[in-house]
Amino acid sequence: MRTTVTCKVCRRLRMSVCGREKCAFKRKPYPPGVHGKAFRRAGSEFGSQLMEKQKVKFLYGLRERQFRNYIMDALKQKTMTTSDAVLNTLETRLDNVTYRLGFAPTRAAARQLVNHGHIYVKRKSLTNFTRVTIPSYKLKIGDEVRIRPESLKKGPFGTLEILIKKHTPPVWLELDREGYLGKILTYPTSGEDISKGYNISAIVEYYSR
């Protein structure tokens, strides 16, 4: 998706879902179009729920069917709240963890790194790292993620050494800045400042209709 199109989506959703530092929403926090600044919509409950759903879909780069399956699975499980289950599924995707560890500037960039084979994963029960090229690959507690050593010499990681020194990952992740290695310490919860900007409960209600 082109930058201009993505940032129009950001402005329409009133949230920077592209993750870019120069996102147009930061300069123009109102919908696109000649009447964008003055535009006011009388929001219904359904409209609000739809808006929240769209935010998360674009934020995590999900297809409609994929996102619906995430919600349906979260509604079926009994081990945690539905909101926590949804957040857990979204945040423990390999592309998102790659982004959260600071290995990529945006989720879209992290998705590309995974697709192109730059990211390796080691399951807690295994001894060796293996290449994983599936962005939606679900990670578990104890799993480790690292950048393929040979890839560090390539273009996508040109400024990583400088940027990663300033990066602070969320508390549920551990980051080894010297080894470009991350580990899942625990699962994220909706009580943390992760889902700021969108309402998971509204999204669950939307799909529960």
State where each predicted segment sits.
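Ferredoxin-like alpha/beta domains used as RNA- or RNAP-binding modules
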Residues: 1-101, 124-209
